[in-house]
């Protein structure tokens, strides 16, 4: 304990040794006065950020802190001077895109639709500079495929991925993929994670790696990438826990605080060429995010499809994003200015500006944090005879009021709005200025306030299932489930999403998707397979129907030479997609059960938690497996103690089972039931089990190649 106290005391002294009146608060630095909310009486004049002396003192203090901090870091800016990574300094807008995004891939046509995806973003908010493609969570852990397996299981595998990346490059968009340090329970990749990531990026021609849950990606990633001859950039999700990591993490995300007076990015202050993408994925109103990004001259994570939950950027925010991004792109070289000055003095309360000086011209990004319009004189700047001033946000030249050595600039700002001012010295002709002003002038005709900022959930619909022909007699191998009243109660167990409207699924009788579901159903009689379809049963189908899917990647992955392994005849068939299962059912004159039919057959009418009762019984289920390979499920008849009240077997704990499919404009998903024997260890982020009969899994769908899983099979139903 004494040693620990000594270490703590020494560490405290080291931190305190770098003296500053304005120490960083995490990844952000407070403004002049060190406060983020004003004292309304005593500090009113300070919070106008006028031309008093405190701003200069604050700025000098921050400059000294930066100078000393870079010495302490042994700072080397080599990575920011590398020609092949200079693009990162213009990488302003980046969505995290689910691989299951329907605008990105068309499973019916079997092709990537990159143009459709990008055209939609161009139309809605002005387009993107890069995209983070997300093929892993939340589906990872349903079987033992690791993060790199799931990427390679995307349609077309490596060759298809390379063509898809080229499609993005053709549109000027860079491509990122993630790396997850927490994925330690699935298949062992057999090499360091940084090597696996670097090799995949080189194979497919990708541009960057996003470090999911990383607070700074270790230097080993940089080294491994360089060794492939295909260097990529690194972008940790969290702000680097050690400032030294800034030297090889050219980008990062910003999970920021949003007080009334904007905070300053510590990382950008230390290294102005470091790109931050401000991320606040669950925010429905993006105003704070966009104002903080614009004030700091950094980017934004335009994330809308959050694990299959749609959080669309509303029209007002989308238009603000279009204009913010356009101005940042037009003046990107100014936004990396070494001597940028946050909190440039302003003349109006609640208006905050940042100065970005360059050769012959200077840009100010301005935000109005007030809930009302602000007009008139806004900022006073040092004046040079012959200089011209432009309201870039509105596309107009400003005629200044000259006050001694200063120019006082007047312009209007909307409530919670934005401004951008450009000063141009005499003899300087900025590139494309006329076109830039013409574009922003056109946009300014539509005030942001005229656009809706209302958030709306995205409705879903269930994919209809055609009824079967009525059997003339009780079908062999099926159990008759009688008609009856059924109190259907089930909850989605998605790890994230709170209790949002739009989460989970929307049954035909509901007016919105939601996590919790309850409905009293009048069940018609039907038949359901006593056991899941086995390997032997599926082999009969293949032989009789000569079925072979067009997209056959991962199809019957455990089979060899057209048949299942010895001893697997009575095990449930797995590595079959929803399409494969439907094809079998159609051949057999059956269909897949609706989820509520599956639950009724498993639960009966007494609301029990498990098919056999209300207490967990290890004898009734397959033994759980916690290793990193996938040994295969138990035989379907191995656990008779697991029978349901109607005598249906193997409903829980052996394999997941397909039921209904749900679709909205951007995502398809399958409801899977029963849970499986496979339980990967080491992380809370793996696909959660749903052994209880009042819980279900939501499995995101993209294409058969990726959807097929080693623990996912099916059983069939038939109408009576």
Predicted regions and their residues:
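Functional-site microenvironments in short loops/helix caps that host divalent-cation chemistry
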Residues: 481, 548, 553-698, 705-710
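An acidic-aromatic substrate-binding cleft motif
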Residues: 53-109, 135-138, 472, 477-482
